[in-house]
Amino acid sequence: MSIKITTLVENSVYGKGLQGEHGLSLLVDTGEHRLLFDTGASDLFIRNARILGIDLKEVDFLVLSHGHRDHTGGLHHFLAVNDKAQVVCKRELFQPKFKDERENGVMQPDALDSTRFRFVDEVTELCRGVFVFPQLPVTDEEDTHFEHFFTWAEGRKQADTCLLYTSDA
């Protein structure tokens, strides 16, 4: 299987006419399916996709790695553009998120159409050769910057972790 990954938005910019922001959004094209990995902090990924000639209406899955605003800030914008993609994420995506003491989570989660969400709790194959891993243990906390990020769950602060996808290609 051949996979093409196109950066729609991230911190640096190398394409003429494109813009960057603190955030991430990648388009993953397997040839059979299109997956959007995160939505950046705003609708900027949509503008960059238009410049690159990418039709986001053709995306089959939106995979949200975690609930921080720089990865989910464009969620509402994407759902307005694409009416078919299944949104894949951990159930904890909507728990309150913080960076230090500042709120940093999904904006207006109550306004979202919950029927489009697929919550994953274990390793799941989304489409042929593409997997999501919702629970990855942190083996070396000193090698991360997670000490600044936490979620509020079960009545207490907890470390905030991510969802990862991989393929056999």
Where are these regions (language model features)?
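Zn-dependent metallo-beta-lactamase
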Residues: 1-32, 127-163
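Pre-active-site segment of Zn-dependent metallo-hydrolases
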Residues: 18-19, 33-61, 151-153
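Active-site metal-binding loops of divalent metal-dependent hydrolases
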Residues: 10-11, 39-42, 67, 92-93, ...
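Flexible, acidic/histidine-containing loops and adjacent segments that form or flank the divalent-metal
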Residues: 85-102, 106-155
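Active-site metal-binding motif and surrounding structural segment of the metallo-beta-lactamase
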Residues: 44-92
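Short, glycine/charged-enriched secondary-structure capping and boundary segments
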Residues: 20-22, 51-52, 77-79, 101-104
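Divalent metal-coordination and catalytic microenvironments
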Residues: 28, 38, 49, 66, ...
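Conserved small/polar residues in nucleotide/adenosyl-binding loops
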Residues: 165-169
